[in-house]
């Protein structure tokens, strides 16, 4: 008998993305949505697909997702972001895993992810296969608190699926800047836990090296203008992350409140 599966989704102001996300996951046995008091129509859209909607203040990606996992009632859990989609082919592969229902096999599965920037699947720049651990047995582990890219920490054997998860990340430059600002703040706060200063070379050489790493070493030049723009953003991300780290430490040393997320 196939085992059951819960889909865990964390949202905040995702009315543009969440319907397509939910459509791709509605075949699962239940959908758990954790919303951080969205100001748009996100919750209204989610109610069309599931009654299992929980609202709580934003406490970081890891804590929000762990909260969703804790409320899942099925044998397996699949973590899905609002800008991601499960294709029919991926659904079939997931259902095959559930149908096997083995107790001594993998307890978690990595799957490749196709990242779409500005409407195009980017195959280079380290964007593919971009393996993500998203499918796991309930109770085998939890996400850590390393923001903004939390890791799932678990005990047991891991397997790999072949079919990719589709990730429609930055659709426009404006989208990229919006996420960029939030993620650089989270990255600076995470770095501040173990580092007490940012040096001048962090703001000069590191961004330059990052650009060449993405554009040349990771062959961003083969992705045309898409690759150039992504490489520039990667360089800017490095600069802003360390600039915010400097600003955060400066504020702490001066007894000021930390910058808001």
Describe these PLM feature segments:
Residues 9-27:
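Short, well-formed alpha-helical segments that are part of the catalytic scaffolds
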Residues 63-70, 76, 80, 87-252, ...:
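Catalytic-site signature of metal-activated, phosphate-bearing donor transferases
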Residues 19, 40-49, 89-90:
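Acidic helix N-cap motif at the loop->helix transition within catalytic regions
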Residues 24, 35-44, 81:
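A conserved acidic beta->alpha catalytic loop
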Residues 43-71, 100:
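Conserved donor nucleotide-binding strand/loop of the catalytic core
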Residues 4-6:
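Cell-envelope/extracellular polymer assembly enzymes that use nucleotide-activated donors
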